[in-house]
Design a protein with these regions (language model features):
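A polyanion-binding, active-site-adjacent surface
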Residues: 2-263
Length: 263
């Protein structure tokens, strides 16, 4: 599948404006470590300390089951599966304890001949419920990010490091990443993307087998050890929702990744 990147300037600007990232186009010369922040005015009023009664907050916490030993993964069998049989196999996976708490697996979705493979970290509550990756607010932001570089969501393939949601949206555990790795590796082999965009620390470090902080991994071109596919690292959309000032850096990463395709 060939990407045309055919958005005209006015359309692209409309998507950037919708994301409140119009400044990305005009601040290219700034270092990633010197992004300007707007100081909000603060009003400090001296007053007597008044102790307020503490309100009781009811918090729901999902209880994780007793962890079973990681089941042996039949890598040889998985390596012979096509995408349809692989997805069916993933649906019945019980290789780690996450199968006890998931609502459903999240295999991935998109164009099977896509040039771009987008890999996130793990499904969240929305994804666990819908069975598709990036369907919540972070997914909406990802869609806008792709549009800004001329890509429709339907033109790429989107997956995660994990196929099941960790309880309470905690970070994936190493043994869970290991249990899912054969599935993801086979997906990559079958999809044969021209480039992989790794979203977030867990995705980047797992794919590239590195413990380097994600901030130091950005802005470089990597190649997967297993199949030499070019890989670019950037921040996860969920992080951008919490830290919108970092959007400019992600815009630079997206342009860098696109350049690898069209050069």
């Amino acid at each position: 599948m060939e990407n045309q990147f055919s958005l005209d300037e006015s359309t692209r600007n409309a998507y950037l404006n919708a994301l409140d990232i119009q400044q990305w186009r005009t601040r290219d010369s700034h270092s990633e470590d010197t992004a300007e922040e707007v100081d909000q005015p603060q009003t400090i009023v001296a007053a007597k300390t008044v102790r307020q009664p503490k309100s009781k907050t009811i918090e729901t916490v999902e209880v994780e089951p007793v962890v079973d030993p990681i089941a042996k993964i039949d890598v040889d069998r998985i390596s012979r599966m096509d995408l349809s049989s692989l997805e069916l196999h993933v649906r019945g996976c019980d290789a780690c304890a996450l199968h006890k708490t998931r609502k459903q697996t999240v295999f991935g979705i998109g164009h099977h001949k896509a040039d771009w493979l987008i890999i996130g970290e793990a499904p969240g509550a929305d994804e666990d419920r819908e069975g598709e990756p990036f369907v919540g607010r972070a997914g909406q932001l990802l869609t806008q990010m792709l549009r800004a570089i001329g890509l429709a969501r339907e033109e790429v393939f989107i997956a995660n490091i994990l196929k099941c949601r960790p309880p309470n949206n905690r970070d994936p555990k190493p043994e869970e990443v290991s249990a899912c790795s054969a599935y993801l590796n086979r997906q990559i082999q079958l999809l044969e993307p021209k480039i992989i965009l790794a979203l977030g620390r867990t995705a980047a470090q797992s794919l590239l087998q590195s413990d380097v902080p994600i901030g130091k991994m950005r802005g470089k071109l990597y190649h997967l050890k297993t199949n030499n596919i070019p890989t670019v690292v950037t921040y996860h959309p969920a992080y951008l929702l919490r830290s919108p000032k970092e959007k400019r850096k992600v815009w630079e990463d997206l342009k860098f990744a696109r350049q690898q395709i069209i050069s």
